[in-house]
Amino acid sequence: MSRVAKAPVVVPAGVDVKINGQVITIKGKNGELTRTLNDAVEVKHVDNALTFGPRDGYADGWAQAGTARALLNSMVIGVTEGFTKKLQLVGVGYRAAVKGNVVNLSLGFSHPVDHQLPAGITAECPTQTEIVLKGADKQVIGQVAADLRAYRRPEPYKGKGVRYADEVVRTKEAKKK
């Protein structure tokens, strides 16, 4: 049995937590995040810590409590420190640029690709082949990074495409004659 839910989430100074039934709102210097938790989870805010436990009558209470603890811990980290995700563009002529909240990509298509960023997410390009995404919501950052990668996934023969900075692309050997 996992014991993730047994560990409390420490709420640092400067972070405001509001519990309204199953709706939890966490506000910090990087913004405000809201999440609705499963009915099987009971959350208590005691002494600058959030504690989790199962409600009576739910068979999967501890499992749901562990999930809720992990989600709220990510929310607390997001509103205090924030999350970043780095992408690299590998390929001849592959470029990225950011204008406002739109990421412009040149990925070898006959047309440029413009990707609209959702609210709360910022992007910057330190070089033409790197994109750095920043924001408070871990799930949204990951989804935007996956959407950008999906335009041109790394292909297995030369490794060209959009990849995560820490991604290792396994390349295949070319067909022998």
UniProtKB/Swiss-Prot annotation:
Molecular-function annotations in GO = rRNA binding; structural constituent of ribosome
Is Ribosomal protein tagged as a keyword?
yes
Keywords from the named record: Ribonucleoprotein, Ribosomal protein, RNA-binding, rRNA-binding
**Single GO BP term:** cytoplasmic translation
One Gene Ontology cellular component term attached to this UniProt record is: cytosolic large ribosomal subunit
Name the domain of life this protein comes from: Bacteria
| Claim: Ribonucleoprotein is one of the keywords in the record | yes
Q: How does it assemble?
A: Part of the 50S ribosomal subunit.
Q: Which PANTHER family match?
A: 60S/50S RIBOSOMAL PROTEIN L6/L9 (PTHR11655), LARGE RIBOSOMAL SUBUNIT PROTEIN UL6M (PTHR11655:SF14)
Q: What does this protein do?
A: This protein binds to the 23S rRNA, and is important in its secondary structure. It is located near the subunit interface in the base of the L7/L12 stalk, and near the tRNA binding site of the peptidyltransferase center.
State the protein's name.
Answer: Large ribosomal subunit protein uL6
